[in-house]
Regions:
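Amphipathic alpha-helical binding modules
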Residues: 62-96
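Amphipathic, soluble alpha-helical interaction motifs
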Residues: 25, 29-32, 36, 53, ...
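Short terminal alpha-helical segments
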Residues: 1-34
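Short, solvent-exposed segments of well-ordered alpha helices
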Residues: 10-13, 17, 37-48, 68
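Generic structural signal for well-ordered, non-transmembrane alpha-helical segments
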Residues: 13, 17, 24, 48, ...
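Helix-centric, low-specificity signal for extended rod-like, repetitive segments
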Residues: 4-5, 27, 44, 66, ...
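Long, amphipathic, charge-rich alpha-helical segments that form helical bundles/coiled-coils
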Residues: 40-64
């Protein structure tokens, strides 16, 4: 999901709707994996930070924030996702 988000952002094609859809898809995937026992509740809660960051990015798009600021925010999301994947390797698939 983050790869798709990054691609859209780098091409300056990210829309509010696309970012919101990615955040919603991530929410559904995370809930499904938590409910099935594929990921722990701790991993689920940690990954929620990434989903929230994507929602913030959607708001940034909607309010016309400068593209360079959105790139900075996305890079922070990506760094946080990498840290989560270090602690919870099973999250690599969801956060990729």
């Amino acid at each position: 999901m983050l790869q798709e988000l990054g691609r859209l952002l780098e091409q300056n094609m990210l829309t509010f709707d696309a970012a919101n859809e990615l955040a919603e898809d991530m929410s559904l995937d995370l809930a499904s994996q938590r409910n099935s026992g594929e990921i722990s509740n701790d991993a689920f809660l940690e990954a929620g930070v990434i989903q929230g960051g994507i929602s913030v990015l959607a708001t940034m798009v909607a309010t016309g924030v400068d593209h360079s600021e959105m790139i900075v925010h996305f890079n922070q999301i990506r760094l946080r996702a990498a840290a989560i994947c270090t602690n919870f390797p099973e999250m690599s698939v969801v956060l990729a």
